[in-house]
Amino acid sequence: MKVALVTGAATGIGAAISRRLASDGMAVGVLDLLSDAARKVADEINSAGGKALALQADITNREQVKAAVARLRDAFGSITVLVNNAGITGSVAFEELTDAQWDRMFEVNTKGTFIVTQVVLPDMKAAGWGRIVNISSSSAQSGAVRMAHYSASKGAIIALTKTLARELGPLGITCNNIPPRFVMNTVMSEKHFSAAPIEAREEWIKAGPICRQGEPEDIAGACAWLVRDETGYVTGQTIGVNGGRYI
């Protein structure tokens, strides 16, 4: 049985990915800063016959991450699948951005991904097999007004993905990224999409050939494909799950 760690797993995309990987037969570490919500997702998985363990950690705190990873390893064994989904968002005009806002965005979105990946990597190296999926954002591809700090932090994730693919490929480890676009029931959706005028929301939805807003399960399906044994020749790629918005 493969063991997967999913960060930001208590709600939205992370919760959907956790459920999907568990349904595919993996033991899943449901890691989030929100311990009660993470426990609820893990309980749902276990009640459905899967295997899951709720974990609490701040991904910017290396010692907390190490402790969470050790708990998951003790429960289920070595971790060979990692989904870096945890992150924050924000909206502020570029000219009004503060150093603190910029630094915090990169600390969580970029440094957090760096820390978790470094902590889990020894398990993958020892196994000679691993799958890393980073959840970035379509904002990193197209840019987003009032979101310079967010877009840049997610763009760094795409660059990190390509670099890890090159470094880790010879070790049997792949690394890919998925940049979602306006997915329902997520922090991004609630803060930006749902708050926009209905005319703007309709225009965004119609911008791609699949005229609907994305669902967390859409991202989970792509992630489940990327972590399969059969996708070992796919690495360093940006898998756009965006309804065809960026063709």
Predicted regions and their residues:
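Short, small/polar-rich loop/turn modules that mediate ligand/substrate recognition or access, typified
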Residues: 83, 169, 174, 234-236
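Substrate-binding pocket helix/loop in short-chain dehydrogenase/reductase
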Residues: 93-94, 101-106, 193, 200, ...
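Active-site helix of classical SDR
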Residues: 117, 153, 161
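Alpha-helical segment proximal to the catalytic Tyr-Lys
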Residues: 122, 166-170, 232
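Residue(s) in the substrate-gating loop at a strand-loop-helix junction
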Residues: 137
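Short C-terminal tail/terminal secondary-structure segment
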Residues: 142, 224, 235-247
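A glycine/serine/threonine-rich, flexible loop-to-helix segment
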Residues: 170, 183-208
